[in-house]
Amino acid sequence: MAVTPACTPSLEDLTYPPGSLVVLTGLPGAGKSTLLDRLYGLRGDETRPVSAGGVRVIDSRQSRSWWAPRLDPLPAPLRTLVVHATHMARICRAVLGGHAVIAHSRGTWPHILYGLAAVARLAGTGLHLVLLDVDPEAARAGQLARGRVVAAPLFARHCRRWRALVARARAGALPPAASVTVLDRPAAGLLRAIRFDGR
């Protein structure tokens, strides 16, 4: 497992084997969607996964936009469950269909990582993690900027899980992943491309 530390000024391209599942994860508001928008030209109003250069780009906003008109009457926890289930199903379908996938995920729940790793193995490929590591204050500011704020108790749980996840990654102790790259905001800003032509 490779762990690339944050603040690496030369880290401009990330390269993975063809057909890999790359999961971009971080705290809510960390800037995951912003990074995908910049790298793949997403507008933010898509309702389905986007094909870009032979890669399926899957952001949870796509599932949220797909369901939006029908979810308004439902309570927030149920809306979140429906969107998350749809998002995970789309990731699994694309990976099992043999596509290279870059997917957005909050990913702080271990069972999600193990589940995605299992799906990748079924497809004969690997799970690779890109951790966008920002402090909670920056993530909270990102939530305010996008107009969707996670409730304080839930966000605190995210933060606890996130700290544990990053600590495990830096220690090389994330067995479900074939590789792990940790980026802070400046390093993410230098990233030019995520490629699927390595070995």
Question: What is each PLM-predicted segment?
Answer:
Residues 1-10:
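N-terminal pre-Walker A segment at the start of P-loop NTPase domains
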Residues 34-97, 140:
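Conserved substrate/cofactor phosphate-moiety recognition/catalytic segment
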Residues 123-142:
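Conserved phosphate-donor/acceptor-positioning beta-strand/loop module used by diverse small-molecule
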Residues 19, 97, 123-128, 174-179:
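Short glycine-/polar-rich loops that comprise or flank the Walker A/P-loop
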